[in-house]
């Protein structure tokens, strides 16, 4: 009733932000997008930031890599359209340890370095 009374419309948070930032314009010349979140699973495709970024990138056929501290249900993430899914954690690690800023920064840097080296190897 409030929406009708105020002549407003309902919009998800990520859609509001992407629209405000003119994200579609900003990525027009991108060859690849790398995005991330703490935990990636089937819920990622239900409106999380990474999925909003993926939706916009797919409109322009830009591949999207997803990095996350924890990954579950990779089949649904690939089905959604992510081109690659990578875990920041180098192996089994407690949630407490994985959230320590120094641990996260070290392993995120390691992972991004590996991804960049892989991309360089396949550059034509």
Each language-model region and where it sits:
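N-terminal loops that bind phosphate or other acidic moieties
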Residues: 1-124
């Amino acid at each position: 009733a409030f929406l009708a009374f105020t002549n407003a419309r309902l919009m998800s948070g990520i859609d509001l932000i992407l629209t405000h930032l003119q994200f579609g314009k900003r990525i027009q010349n991108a060859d690849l997008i790398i995005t991330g979140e703490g935990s990636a699973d089937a819920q990622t495709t239900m409106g999380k930031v990474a999925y909003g970024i993926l939706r916009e990138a797919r409109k322009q056929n830009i591949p999207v890599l997803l990095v996350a501290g924890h990954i579950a249900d990779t089949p649904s993430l690939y089905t959604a359209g992510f081109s690659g899914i990578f875990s920041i954690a180098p192996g089994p690690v407690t949630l407490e340890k994985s959230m320590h800023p120094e641990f996260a920064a070290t392993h995120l840097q390691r992972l991004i370095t590996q991804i960049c080296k892989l991309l360089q190897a396949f550059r034509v």
